[in-house]
Amino acid sequence: MFLTLRRWNRVSKDVWCLLCISLSVMATPVSACSRVVYRGPDGAVVVGRTMDWEQSLEVNLWAFPAGLERDGNAGARSLKWKSKYGSVAATCYDKLVADGMNEKGLVVNVLYLSSSVYPQFDGTRPTLSIGAWAQYVLDTFATVDEAVTVLKDEPFQLGVLIMPGGHAGTVHLSLADATGDSAIFEYIDGKLVVHHGKQYSVMTNDPSYDQQLALNGYWQEVGGSIMLPGTERPADRFVRASYYLGEAPQTSDEREQIASVFSIIRNVSAPIGAVHAGQPNVAATLWRIVADQKRGVYYFELTDTPNIFWVDLSKLDLSVGQPVRMLPVEDAPVMAGEVSSRFEKQTDFQFMVGSDPGEEK
């Protein structure tokens, strides 16, 4: 105890400033999704994430082939594109893509960020619904570097959307590829901020990513074996995820890799009953996803069912000309094991409409 107190007494003024930032986060709406990137021996890369919300998001899994004609569904200048790569994606309400992995091993995760501010449409660039942001990346890029090279120049503008219940769908985007490269995309004060590099292996929600990194730096000074913050606040989850990711075993055993990532994201999951009135994002974890990018396997776990099931992308024909297929998840019988054969042909959906952020002010 004496040594611990001495360490606390040596905390610099800068560190106390970080504590003030941490306390200020408590006064803001708290978001509750988390994402980690595990890198193991022999080129293993595994991404895990949680999805937390106050009500059902009516999640389903979709298998999209290459060669699909797409529309960004964001007004007269809506972006049009053709999918270059096939992918498996998790959708909300069958109107927006929240998560996915493409056939090249690129994983995209959408997480809530209440402090996002998007620029209003300037009338000169194509527009894209935020509900289609993740799918555009999955359709278009094979690596994080490819995506950053194009997206940093903002070739399109994002149209905001309103979620069922009237809540704004303000988000940030994380990418990781089969090499372990990683990137975070945020809109802060109307400007795109990109964090690119393998060091960006953990993401939660508010505050902005640079502040999350600063807060995590403080807790690294304290030392996770001495104390870890335990609430469901994003900053606390960021610290716990970072610490336990650093403790994860470096193993070539596939089962242990997947189990390690599941154990980390379960640690940062919010319990059933964690609902705060007026804050839909401070809520129980609805589901968890782990993506094995080296082997092309997409694992899924619903909080209220006892089993994990997974999709081996190599068992899905995602080539040009193949049909769009869907696997019902939330209202389906309990599933376990590999489920690629259970996808059924389905008519493609239209992305949720994205509108000019200027109209929301």
Predicted regions and their residues:
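N-terminal secretory signal peptides that target proteins for export/translocation
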Residues: 1-11
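Bacterial N-terminal signal peptides
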Residues: 15-26
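Catalytic cofactor-binding cores of redox enzymes
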Residues: 153-190
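C-terminus-biased signal that marks the final domain/tail of proteins
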Residues: 31-46, 159-163, 167-169, 178, ...
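Structural recognition of the beta-strand scaffold that forms the well-ordered cores
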Residues: 46-48, 107-110, 174-176, 184, ...
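A contiguous strand-loop segment
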Residues: 32-125, 158, 336-337, 341
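Proteins synthesized as precursors that undergo proteolytic processing into mature forms
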Residues: 124-160, 254-263, 272
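Short acidic-glycine loop/turn motifs at beta-strand connectors
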Residues: 39-42, 102-104, 176-180, 186-191, ...
